[in-house]
């Protein structure tokens, strides 16, 4: 017992020290995006591709360098290939010349509308933002949010010299909590392919001090260090109400355990098991706490590439089930998350450096007392026709125009649309 308390204390102290070292960096990061800006980008994309969604190379600007996306200036239209998977190729394009609004573009030979629909359904629970879908003659395209730090694998490799246990703890906490939230709302959801290449990392997000994660009776106060992990690539995913031909065929059930009734902890197991394999294989020294955590919460029979419970790192289909697997509640009670349970005076000082989230400002309460709506504006265009608001008067349907005329106290009995418009002109245009 004393040994466990020692480890808890040691890991918590290391977490606070790491937090001190990165606190100022988190607060002073440049080019960060707020949630409002990220949502607005989706509207920009939809506007940009309107009518020409099958030709993204004609719409977006091509980043000029492989070393920096944000801030690169380009006058050349086109895309840059950034990845390739089993379901298609992924390209990068920019809405603007400065590439402050990058977009990921996935092109597949087959229709993947089911993938877009599944991703769209869970995006608010921290799936990748799905902007638009376009069905073309011989291929289909999904426009999604671009994660500036790439996949979890590339993020770890590219930051190996500065990576600390706090970074991995933050990412693991985000992924597990997001899966928990998704399962609470959509119990039938399975990602089925959640390895380190299908978790995307964004480091250009705004830090908000502390984020409160509630898992049943557990409350974690997670320190926001400006890193966000999201789920990506829903080609093998399933959720009630959306057919997926890739898994509904049954081709992946026996070998990979992929089918609609797979174990509800399938994604948690595959993510943790594949992450452990990656950290050990790449010899990531800062990953030791995470490796030890995974080996505590996953039974020995569920670790590695092949056991009688696991095939290719995935849960096997078995008639006896997987009763040894822990629930979300039990996993989040592990000491790995202890830095998020207690608030010390020292930790409070560090959070002051990061900056606490501003309290939510309540929206003004508008009390409706009835009465007539504000009268619309009547004007005459340069071409001489009558306008009501922003529309031509004669473009309104008869019943719509009668309601407007009644508000403006213009008689309408036995009058045509043309006559009502003329009367409005006579009354309001001097």
Give, region by region, the residue ranges found by the protein language model:
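ATP-binding glycine-rich loop module of kinase domains
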Residues: 80, 87-121
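Basic helix-extension-helix modules of the SAP/HeH family
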Residues: 371-372, 376-430
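Conserved structural core of kinase catalytic domains
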Residues: 128-164
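Helical subdomain adjoining the active site within ATP-dependent kinase catalytic cores
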Residues: 255-364
